[in-house]
Amino acid sequence: MKKTQTWIITCIYLQLLLFNPLVKTQEICRNPVTDNVKDITKLVANLPNDYMITLNYVAGMDVLPSHCWLRDMVTHLSVSLTTLLDKFSNISEGLSNYSIIDKLGKIVDDLVACMEENAPKNVKESLKKPETRNFTPEEFFSIFNRSIDAFKDFMVASDTSDCVLSSTLGPEKDSRVSVTKPFMLPPVAASSLRNDSSSSNRKAAKSPEDPGLQWTAMALPALISLVIGFAFGALYWKKKQSSLTRAVENIQINEEDNEISMLQQKEREFQEV
């Protein structure tokens, strides 16, 4: 009985061992953007217009492909949001400044984790370092929303294009973020975050986050581990049945031998009489 339990436990752990790493990998890069980004409008309204938020701004954000600056930008956004969070007290519930910033920080942290797992390869990066600047809440969260919007295209972005700023790009063209338009949440804060625009729909077939591909990738190792578990169970059952059959045969042989011995003993006693 103990051996049977041992085999069952072994099969279960084998399935978990094969299945769990893939699930973990899939979870890291699922879309981390939630409806919490809709609260940015309220947060910007709560902060003074002259309140300055420090951010290491990645040069070339306005002229380079998103995969060139997105990884560094979300990392710097995470640092700035953490610093901003420390300036508020967690004393109120609901949509307080603290809770909004905390939720936005968690979104960015998930983006950072995904960037680390899927860093572009063979990319010639610019040697220009990020510049530390101060932004108003309106400017800062415009950059935040733009970074989230760029994340949608990150998985299908080119891994080979260079990320070097052109020599004709002067510091005047990249020294500030354009905020000539009134602050508005881009479509990313609403419908674009979930079931996106036509451009993302065109890329869905190639995207590694296609639901069909995800389920296939998750089901395949689970099926393999299940088959292996049943195979081990079948082998053990066959071995157990063989042992039981031999044991029954041995018992029957012993009983027959005992009966023969008893008959022979009675026959000798009868002859003696």
UniProtKB/Swiss-Prot annotation:
Regions of this protein lying in the Cytoplasmic compartment: 238-273
Keyword Membrane in annotation: yes
Record field: transmembrane: 215-237
GO cellular component labels: cytoplasm; cytoskeleton; extracellular space; filopodium; lamellipodium; membrane; plasma membrane
Site positions per UniProt: Not glycosylated: 97
The organism's place on the tree of life at top rank: Eukaryota
InterPro entries in UniProt: 4_helix_cytokine-like_core, SCF
Pyrrolidone carboxylic acid carried by residues: 26
Keyword Heme: no
Keywords tagged on the record: Cell adhesion, Cell membrane, Cell projection, Cytoplasm, Cytoskeleton, Disulfide bond, Glycoprotein, Growth factor, Membrane, Pyrrolidone carboxylic acid, Secreted, Signal, Transmembrane, Transmembrane helix
Entry function: Ligand for the receptor-type protein-tyrosine kinase KIT. Plays an essential role in the regulation of cell survival and proliferation, hematopoiesis, stem cell maintenance, gametogenesis, mast cell development, migration and function, and in melanogenesis. KITLG/SCF binding can activate several signaling pathways. Promotes phosphorylation of PIK3R1, the regulatory subunit of phosphatidylinositol 3-kinase, and subsequent activation of the kinase AKT1. KITLG/SCF and KIT also transmit signals via GRB2 and activation of RAS, RAF1 and the MAP kinases MAPK1/ERK2 and/or MAPK3/ERK1.
Protein name, entry field: Kit ligand
